[in-house]
Amino acid sequence: MIHHIPNVLNKEQVAEFRKLMEEANWVGGKVTAGTLSASVKRNQQLSEQDPLTHHLSDIVIKAIWQNPLFQAAALPHKIIPPLFNRYDEHESFGFHVDNSIRLIRGTAEQIRTDLSCTLFLSEPDEYEGGDLVIEDTYGYHEVKLPAGDVVLYPSTSLHEVSSITAGTRFASFFWVQSLVRDDSKRHLLFSLDESIRELRKSHGDSYSEVMKLTNIYHNLIRMWSEL
């Protein structure tokens, strides 16, 4: 399931990110690509060792851990520290699948990539082309969101960033190991969580059905989660 998570960063944070990123030193994006995907990757990234990467990454991590919609959709267990990229004119990243296992930067710890995330840092009208195209069982989905918004989708999906024809596309990208690895189970839990939240709004926390459904939700988490 593809999720749109709005306003992960506010406009002031985005403006500060952009100021710092536009003055930064960029390296070729192939450094974080697998052998196969490197052949179709043409973009630029902030170095993983750059202090700016660490600074911006910490802000993104704090924002997503505090975002209730992200928590409900991803059920995150571990998060790869975010990286940052830019696509200038004629740059793109052809169809590829993300590596199934990745190292957490600066450690020997590995995580399973269940969910891929893109945090948009350019407004849609600042560049042409550059859509994130995600392929799933229902076809192709073209994604271009406002700056500060996140798209969250299963890492099993083939996806690409189409060629930039004008302007520059700035973004952050990262991966999540979920408490629940199966996408269909996460979808079910998210739908159940949505129903509980709507019932709480309309009937209050003391409504008996809220308590019953909350009990079911947490028992399913116990049944399906991996720690």
Swiss-Prot record:
The keyword Iron applies. Its EC number is 1.14.11.-. Residues 78-178 form the Fe2OG dioxygenase domain. Its cofactor is Fe(2+); L-ascorbate. It is an enzyme of class 1 (oxidoreductase). InterPro entries: Oxoglu/Fe-dep_dioxygenase_dom (IPR005123), PKHD_C (IPR041097), PKHD_hydroxylase (IPR023550), Pro_4_hyd_alph (IPR006620), Pro_4_hyd_alph_FE2OG_OXY (IPR044862). One of its GO terms (biological process) is DNA damage response. One of its GO terms (molecular function) is L-ascorbic acid binding. Gene3D superfamilies: q2cbj1_9rhob like domain, Rabenosyn, Rab binding domain. The keyword Metal-binding applies. It holds the Pfam family PKHD_C. Fe cation binds at residues 96, 98, 159. Keywords: Dioxygenase, Iron, Metal-binding, Oxidoreductase, Vitamin C. Binds 1 Fe(2+) ion per subunit. 2-oxoglutarate binds at residue 169. HAMAP family: Hydroxyl_YbiX (MF_00657). This is PKHD-type hydroxylase A1S_0473. It comes from Acinetobacter baumannii (strain ATCC 17978 / DSM 105126 / CIP 53.77 / LMG 1025 / NCDC KC755 / 5377).
